Regions:
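Aromatic-rich peripheral "rim/lid" segments of glycoside hydrolase catalytic domains that contact
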Residues: 279, 293-294, 298-305, 312, ...
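Long amphipathic alpha-helical scaffold segments
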Residues: 127-186, 190, 194
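Active-site-adjacent "subsite" loops/lids of carbohydrate-active enzymes
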Residues: 240-278, 416-435
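N-terminal substrate-binding region of glycoside hydrolase catalytic domains
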Residues: 29-32, 174-264, 288, 365, ...
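Active-site cleft segment of glycoside hydrolase catalytic domains centered on the general acid/base Glu
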Residues: 212-225, 252-349, 374-385, 465-477
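Aromatic-lined carbohydrate-recognition surfaces of secreted/lumenal glycan-active proteins
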Residues: 175-184, 286-289, 309-345, 366, ...
Length: 495
């Protein structure tokens, strides 16, 4: 078993740093390795099954940026401890420098205010390295370097987004990217319908199996029939699904009696797929056939079972709708869940296995619920977000992205999961203002990416049952949050 050791200063950091136990080591392919975190005094011990060089990924307190996940450069194991702040500063500078080279090679004009920040971060890192005989002093200089380089990364990425959007708007006065939201599993009130239409040109009709067939043979189509009719009347681009949710509690409860009988279970799944696609054939042309098969958790399905099931679902769906487009929802695309040691495949390896097998996938939908645990994604800065999208683009499939971000931290009575809000994960504590500003920062980045064909918000109203607590754009009382105004401004600006 391999062990990587890091010295943490100031030592009092551990007193209010619960995120430390979600840290993990990753390889050169960015896949997370099963990692056990231990704290001993001021030492952070990262235990894993191999001794290969790797990167420590950890949510680190950065004034002005919240607690974004930072990564060290690739480090070999050694007997004496690394100074964690120094290695995080080095890793951030390397990341930004590498991305700078890529964007320069693509012809990007580098903003003038980036250079002094980047240079100052280098200078501070050099000072921290020079005084490593005093870990506390080295950590102080390294922390200053991290702050400067995070500022530099934000300046650089904002400039990239601005330049890319300018180019895209020269090609398309109205962006070809679909901007949509889920209609939820209950009818929208008339005022909510207007709120929806003012912000979006696309709609996801959930068609979730557990709501359509809560008891075997008892189908309830009324809400979804009405949603499809309403979407077509208002000329919205419709996406159906996810039809099958392979996360915990995502399938109908009555199906649990078949969880140890895979072949009968597969038969039930395929029958439902055929039924729902046949019902809306010709009205819905884009189908999200399955959600969260990479992380899983539904019934007793193994990783291999889920791969086989998704392949069979795709086969049946294509037989029913020969002209349809079929996409797969991948959750937690950075793959933090692998650190728990229950998965062999990273999210990208899971999707790649289907692509290499010749499955008829039209696109990948990345579900990114920022600021949630344990089944969400930790906060990351703009440049990290951009790099993740670029990495997924390597698969050669168009991308859709489904987003969620909390507007409050307390318990949400309408949430359908046990997800909790990490209130301090982003630069502003979880609030309606934070949600609005996050949308204004991150949605334009996605719109700047040609590989992203659609951006969807997870749900409109917090009055509906929903997966991500407080992620709606409308309060339970029907009043729009600040985030809804941000969505409307983006719609007016880009479409």
């Amino acid at each position: 078993m391999g062990v990587m050791r890091f010295a943490v200063h100031p030592t009092g950091l551990f007193d209010d740093w619960p995120e430390v136990h979600r840290a993990y080591i990753s390889g050169v392919d960015q896949a997370a390795w099963p990692t056990r975190i231990e704290v001993a005094g001021n030492q952070l011990l990262c235990r894993r099954q191999n001794s290969d060089s790797g990167k420590l990924n950890i949510a680190w307190p950065v004034p002005g940026f919240g607690r974004p996940v930072l990564a060290t450069a690739s480090l070999p194991e050694r007997q004496h401890s690394y100074i964690l702040a120094v290695e995080l500063a080095r890793g951030k500078i390397v990341q930004v420098r590498n991305q700078l080279a890529v964007w320069q090679a693509a012809g990007m004009a580098i903003p003038e205010d980036f250079v002094p920040l980047h240079r100052e971060a280098h200078r501070l890192l050099a000072r921290s390295v020079a005084v490593q005989h005093d870990p506390a002093e080295a950590s102080e200089f390294a922390q200053q370097a991290i702050i400067k380089e995070c500022e530099a990364a934000e300046v650089l990425t904002r400039s990239y987004v601005s330049q890319r959007l300018e180019v895209r708007h020269r090609q398309y006065p109205q962006l070809p990217t679909v901007f949509g939201c889920s209609l939820g599993d209950s009818p929208l009130a008339p005022e909510q319908q207007q709120q929806f239409l003012s912000g979006f040109n696309g709609a996801a009709v959930p068609l979730q199996w557990r709501y359509i067939e809560p008891e075997e043979g008892d189908y309830r189509w009324e809400t979804y029939d009405a949603q499809v009719d309403w979407g077509m009347e208002n000329q919205l681009l419709l996406r159906g699904g996810p039809l099958v949710d392979l996360s915990p509690n995502g399938l109908p409860k009555w199906l649990s009696q078949w969880e140890h009988d895979y072949w009968n279970l597969q038969s039930f799944v395929c029958d439902f797929i055929e039924t729902v696609i046949s019902r809306y054939l010709g009205r819905i042309r884009i189908w999200e056939i399955a959600a969260r098969p990479n992380a899983g958790g539904a019934l007793a399905l193994t990783e291999e079972n889920r791969l086989t099931l998704v392949a069979k679902i795709l086969e049946v769906a294509r037989q029913v709708d020969q002209e349809g487009q079929f996409l797969l929802r991948i959750d937690q695309p950075w793959g933090e869940y692998q650190a728990r040691g229950q998965h062999k495949l990273s999210p990208m390896h899971f999707a790649d296995a289907l692509v290499r097998a010749g499955m008829d996938l039209s696109a990948i939908n990345l579900e990114i619920g920022v600021g949630y645990s344990p089944m969400g994604s930790a906060s990351r800065d703009l440049i990290d977000f951009s790099r993740m999208i670029d990495q997924w683009s390597v698969l050669g499939l168009p991308l859709q992205v489904t987003l969620a971000f909390p507007s409050a931290a307390e318990h949400d009575p309408n949430q359908t999961t046990d997800l909790e809000v990490d209130a301090r994960s982003w630069k502003i504590l979880a609030s309606e203002e934070a949600q609005a500003r996050w949308i204004e920062d991150y949605v334009p980045l996605l719109l700047a990416k040609p590989s992203v064909l659609a951006v969807f918000w997870n749900h409109l109203s917090d009055a509906q049952p929903h997966r991500f607590p407080h992620a709606g754009l409308v309060r339970p009382d029907g009043q729009a949050k600040a985030a809804h105004a941000s969505i409307v401004r983006l719609r007016e600006l880009h479409w």
